[in-house]
Design a protein with these regions (language model features):
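An interfacial alpha-helical scaffold signature
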Residues: 1-140
Length: 140
């Protein structure tokens, strides 16, 4: 029996289908409790494209798909349950490098990346913060 998708998984599906509202997606991500795998007390992340991605999952089923390939094998994968807002507002800035949030990366056709840009992460760690400020300075 397949469990129903979370509200965030629904927003991701809408966005991937081209019918979602990006602001609603970001809002849902911020309100959602996400499961972040941990190893030795450190949150799981991966580097790709010059960005460190904190990997998080919308539910235990999505986390289990990931654990099949990346888990410790003979024992359950530890994880932390964190609000999306806490991940992008506190965890990401604490990494000290460009970082974003990758959700449900083991779900075929169901993943979503929240890059380190203004409107997702705090301006102080957003990679586009200077460009946004320049745009505002010209009366846009």
């Amino acid at each position: 029996v397949e469990q129903p998708r979370t509200a965030l998984a629904e927003r991701i599906a809408e966005q991937r289908a081209g019918v979602g509202d990006p602001r609603a997606l970001i809002g849902e991500m911020r309100r959602s409790v996400l499961l972040v795998p941990s190893i030795d007390g450190r949150l799981w992340s991966a580097h790709s494209g010059g960005v460190r991605w904190v990997c998080a999952f919308t539910d235990e089923t999505a986390l289990a798909r990931f654990a099949l390939h990346h888990g410790p094998g003979d024992r359950p994968m530890d994880y932390a349950a964190l609000l999306g807002a806490r991940i992008v507002d506190e965890v990401v800035p604490g990494l000290g490098e460009p970082a974003g949030l990758a959700v449900d990366i083991a779900s075929e056709g169901g993943s979503m990346f929240f890059p380190p840009i203004t409107g997702i992460v705090p301006d102080g760690v957003a990679v586009d913060a200077d460009a946004v400020e320049e745009g505002r300075g010209r009366g846009r």
